[in-house]
Swiss-Prot record:
Task performed by this protein: Golgi membrane protein involved in vesicular trafficking.
Glycosylated residues, chain numbering: 135
Encoding gene (name): TVP23
Sorted UniProt keywords: Glycoprotein, Golgi apparatus, Membrane, Transmembrane, Transmembrane helix
Entry's family note: Belongs to the TVP23 family.
Coiled coil: none
UniProt cross-references to PANTHER family, sorted A to Z: GOLGI APPARATUS MEMBRANE PROTEIN TVP23 (PTHR13019:SF7)
Gene Ontology BP, a term: vesicle-mediated transport
TM ranges: 91-111, 113-133, 177-197, 201-221
Species whose genome carries this gene: Laccaria bicolor (strain S238N-H82 / ATCC MYA-4686)
Pfam families: DUF846
Entries under InterPro entries matching the protein: TVP23-like
Identification of the protein by name: Golgi apparatus membrane protein TVP23
């Protein structure tokens, strides 16, 4: 019995010693973890310097949106307009004559004091623009043309020509033509007001002539465009008649189309 108690005491002492060793090891490991963070004990897979390009400057990314275009975009700006145009030559000369007439009128006083030379230059450019717009640019860009004709009885009337509706105009050509047609008369009107305010009565006849030429083209092409739309409406009604909608139904359809076009464009 005494030997059993002695063995039990020896076993208990050994067990206490083992617990003391485990506790001291745990305390040492906890102290190391607090003093040295875990991230410092983990080595990175690759050095950070290898993933950074230090040879060239960083460039800001370009974000393209429907309303944003880069400088190198071939479809942006004046170059893009001429590339999308079906008749770039006609479009070029339309704006060339109009811009040249205004530029010569504004800048002629800076380069020469000869009033006759300045007047002749502006009038020639206005005449060339009037003829080009009515006979070349209008027919080529939007498929419209007009002129005034006198019959045998001495009565004058307007004649309008329009392109076949099955061959519509290029959207860029049409847009740029109508912009030029309506914007430049406004510019000449501003120049007329400036001449009146500055009491430059010597140049008022030139501005008045420019307004006459430009407004004539505006009225002529506006009526030509309306006449073309009315012809298109008539052709649509005629095709409906040919498809079997004759009689009262065809007459009602024809009248409805004509009235609708007249209210919109008349």
């Amino acid at each position: 019995m005494a030997e059993l108690k002695k063995g039990h005491r020896v076993f208990s002492g050994q067990l206490i010693a083992v617990f003391a060793v485990v506790e001291s090891s745990y305390t040492l490991h906890t102290t190391m973890s607090v003093a040295q963070p875990l991230l410092d004990t983990i080595e990175p897979d690759e050095p950070l310097e290898s993933s950074v390009n230090t040879k060239g400057p960083a460039t800001a990314p370009v974000v393209l949106t429907p309303t944003h275009a880069t400088q190198n975009d071939p479809e942006s700006g004046i170059v893009g307009i001429f590339r999308q145009s079906a008749h770039p030559t006609a479009l070029f000369f339309l704006y060339l004559f109009r811009i040249a007439a205004i530029a010569v009128y504004i800048l002629c006083g800076w380069f020469t004091d000869n009033y006759v030379l300045s007047t002749v230059a502006v009038v020639v450019l206005l005449a060339m623009d009037f003829w080009n717009c009515r006979n070349v640019s209008g027919r080529t860009l939007v498929g419209l043309r007009f002129w005034n004709q006198v019959d045998e009885d001495g009565e004058s009337y307007w004649v309008f020509e329009s392109r076949d509706p099955s061959r519509p105009a290029n959207p860029i050509d049409s847009k740029m033509f109508w912009i030029a047609l309506y914007v430049f008369p406004l510019l000449w009107s501003v120049l007329l007001i400036v001449s009146l305010l500055k009491l430059g009565f010597a140049f008022i006849p030139i501005v008045v002539l420019a307004l006459v030429f430009n407004i004539t083209n505006v009225i002529g092409f506006t009526y030509a465009d309306r006449d073309a739309k009315q012809k298109w409406a008539t052709s649509v009604a005629g095709s409906a008649w040919g498809m079997g909608l004759g009689g009262i139904g065809g007459q009602i359809l024809t009248g409805a189309v004509k009235k609708g076009v007249g209210r919109v464009f008349g």
